[in-house]
Amino acid sequence: MRKLVAGKLHGIHVTEANLNYHGSITLDPDHCEAAGILPMEFVEIWNKNSGARISTYVILGERGSRCCILNGAAARTCQPDDPIIVCNSIYLDEAHITSLKPRIVTFDQDNHILDRLSYSVDIDTDGRYSFAILDEADEPLVIPALVSGA
């Protein structure tokens, strides 16, 4: 079994950091449903400003609020307006990787959904993997590559 990405809220902005709450991250149910994130599910959080990485669990806030609130100890790692990535995962046998279609949701500064993307992995007859990022119409997008200084 391998731990693989199941869904992501990419670039969602922190709306509040509440040190005195019990812990967790509070998210708009609309956003969670778009990415396939469940209430009480453990997620990884990566702060794009500070590089901080934490793990916590999801609680649902008010539907339509576009909230993203870091609670308890997690509030020390993120400040309001920080763009973060919230990622859930799944354990899956490698033989089933081509059936996994993680849902990726991107956001504007006010946490309105910009894009609904998915990831796709295929395997050829020689056992080599290929990877694609697909838009809502299942059309592949360009994948950024690290290019050395030419």
UniProtKB/Swiss-Prot annotation:
Pfam family of the protein (one): Asp_decarbox
Function: Catalyzes the pyruvoyl-dependent decarboxylation of aspartate to produce beta-alanine.
Annotated family: Belongs to the PanD family.
Gene Ontology MF terms: aspartate 1-decarboxylase activity
Keyword Amino-acid biosynthesis: no
EC number: 4.1.1.11
Record's protein name: Aspartate 1-decarboxylase 1
Pathway entry: Cofactor biosynthesis; (R)-pantothenate biosynthesis; beta-alanine from L-aspartate: step 1/1
Matching NCBIfam families: panD (TIGR00223)
Binding site for substrate: T56, G72, A73, A74
Record note on modification: Is synthesized initially as an inactive proenzyme, which is activated by self-cleavage at a specific serine bond to produce a beta-subunit with a hydroxyl group at its C-terminus and an alpha-subunit with a pyruvoyl group at its N-terminus.
Signal peptide: none
Cofactor(s), names only, from the UniProt record: pyruvate
Gene3D superfamilies, sorted: 2.40.40.20
Modified residues (Pyruvic acid (Ser)): S24
Keyword field contains Methyltransferase: no
SUPFAM superfamilies in the cross-refs: ADC-like (SSF50692)
The gene coding this protein: panD1
Assembly mode: Heterooctamer of four alpha and four beta subunits.
Keywords of the record: Autocatalytic cleavage, Cytoplasm, Decarboxylase, Lyase, Pantothenate biosynthesis, Pyruvate, Schiff base, Zymogen
Cofactor note (record): Binds 1 pyruvoyl group covalently per subunit.
Entries under InterPro entries matching the protein: Asp_de-COase-like_dom_sf (IPR009010), Asp_decarbox (IPR003190)
Coiled coil ranges: none
Subcellular localization, as worded in the UniProt entry: Cytoplasm
